[in-house]
Amino acid sequence: MICIFSVLYFFYKASIYRRITLSGTVKFFYSSIITGGLAAFLLIPVAISLSTGKADFNLFSEAITIKQNLSRFLIKLFIGSYNMGQVMKSPTNIYCSVMVAELLILYFFNKEINIRNKIASLIVMVFIALSFFISTFILLWHGFDYPIGFQYRNSFIFCFFIITLAYECWLKIKRSNFNGLIITVLFFAVASIYVSYGEYDYLDTNKIVSTFIISLCYIIVFMICIKFNGISRIILPLISLLVITELTLNAYLSMKNIKYIHKAHIGEYIETVSPLIEEVKSLNDNFYRIEQVYRNTLNDSMLLNYNGLGHSSSANEENTAKLIKSFGFKTSVINNVYNMGSTIPIDSILGIKYLISMEQPEFFKCYKYKQNMFYKKVKTEGSYAVYENPYALPIAFMVNERLESTNINEVKNKFVYSNDILKLMVNENYDIYKVLNITDIKLNNLSEVKYDDETVYQKEIKGVKSTIEL
């Protein structure tokens, strides 16, 4: 996206200054190639990493569609219009102060800025804005594939461009006219009324009213600048105070909506579990994995420095994720989660030798681990306990060559797949997992959803207890 914008911005500036020359264009592209070469030590590993995971060419994989409506674009002009729910599916993050939005409107009514510049600026704005609505342009700006989380990542480019236009208008504010001010007020008034009728869990009436009041304050300052023919010494401190107030309020309201784990809990958790991890690591000098039957963070293995299975990364290796999913673990495009445990055979194949559980769950109430008769408790630290899997296999072990015939792309039933893997490993026709003969199933607050050879149960009423009786 930086390359696209660099080319766009080069020709934009060249057209404004009317200096599009062959020599200048050659120098620009020559410099761009050198810049790309200097960054190759970083770009090449990233490209290789993405090629094994989420990267794909999807530019022509679907029909041209509209990905969001205008209201989702407008709400991002308001103070505090953000929450953590927008991480995976977010509207365009174009907020960069009400002042910038107003100056952008006034830019097109400023008499000192010639019509050629306005047309060129509008063309660039529209071209970038298309990538917020039309699927083909979104894919074009994002390397021909949709990003995982934090959508519309080129929004910072749009912000940069409109800030430069707003700054140019601010420098020439004395040449703005009152018609532009009236249109700006009407724009924010109509936008406020329009947005107030929508249902957004991160935007309420107080935020909308606050935004409109601040927009009026800016308008008053702009009127003073126009009336007194310039920016006086009083205006600069006043406008600075307004901007600082607005951005501080936006930061506070945005951060307030984000839920964090208490620092005291994390500190206590590390202080308690780290010594336990180190003791467990000292029990064996071979490669093995440690896992938890509760979930504190998605990357606890990195937090506590041990070899684990659970991992969260936006560049997940595709084949690893497929294998983990085929064994029945909870996965997504960015997460592999061990969760509440696995089966003994799968634990053993994956080298999971130690399991950490909470004996008396306080922070993890739903993760009380029920020890199976084959795992032995070897360590205890506070409310945490470590269980050892005596059947854990090393990092490499001999298997029958028939194992090569398996295909993780054809997996339907996880238990059948695990049986096939285990049988092929030892070349024996024996099923570890047996099908239960269930005569009756009673569901309470659950509904069945069939996926190939498996059944998934989903809650009908959230927040209400659900049970399955066999």
Predicted regions and their residues:
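Membrane-interfacial segments
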Residues: 15-19, 50, 54, 58, ...
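Periplasmic/ER-lumenal interhelical loops and adjacent helix-loop junctions
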Residues: 24-120, 127, 134-156, 196-205, ...
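Flexible, solvent-exposed extracytoplasmic
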Residues: 346, 351-470
